[in-house]
Amino acid sequence: MDSVMIPVDIAPDAVVDYLNALRGWQNMTGVLVTVPHKQRAAALVDELTPRARRLNAINVIRKLADGRLQGDMLDGVGFQLAAEAQGFQPAGKQALLSGCGGVGSAIAWGLCEAGIRQLALHDQNPTTRQRLHDLLAEAFPAVQLSALPDTLHGVDLLVNGSPAGMAGFDELPLPQALLDTLDSATHVADVVTAPVMTPLLTFAAARGCRVQTGPEMALAQMTLMGQF
């Protein structure tokens, strides 16, 4: 079946009406959800996959035969596939995640499932960080969870899961003084898709780090989205 993807810019207060319209949209089979609607949409669809229910966020919706909307969260899977394509394996490694919202939560969950040894969590909103910390602590008691460290020495993976680097947001997700301790061996990833080379990735590349862009994560999950 031939399909077309149509970009739709929805205001936050119009999400309810938009999803209600989708239920009666006869030639619509699914929707991709992006910032800032991933958590809001999760609360409004009719059904969630077990993964999306745990994370309370979605980035893809499909319409079931009876018209109900089902949501799933594939950002974590996409991130893992993109990282593996560059040769990064998280098992036994140490990671730092900045941004504990919808996409960050999905990435953190995926890293824990893949056997990450230690994971530092950072978010500008302490409540958001604590919510993810508690979720992971209960589900993955073997993973060492911590707050923002004093140095990035020894960190194998640094992930920006926040909007930092997008137009209108802070350029860097972490203090410059902390970033100045970044090792060249660290794998640095960003979820921001535009610009492709964010300020964080540009800085990391200049230090000799291997970098993973937002579009790489997005493209890695496209097949899974189509199959959902």
Predicted regions and their residues:
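Rossmann-like adenosine-cofactor binding region
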Residues: 138-212
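Conserved S-adenosyl-L-methionine
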Residues: 113-118, 207-209
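NAD(P)-binding Rossmann-fold cofactor-contacting core
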Residues: 116-136
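Active-site capping/gating segments
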Residues: 81, 85, 193-194, 209-228
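Phosphate/diphosphate ligand-binding glycine-rich loop within oxidoreductases
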Residues: 1-86
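Conserved beta-strand positions in the Rossmann-like core of class I SAM-dependent methyltransferases
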Residues: 6, 119-120, 212
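Glycine-rich adenosine-cofactor-binding loop
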Residues: 73, 83, 88, 92-112, ...
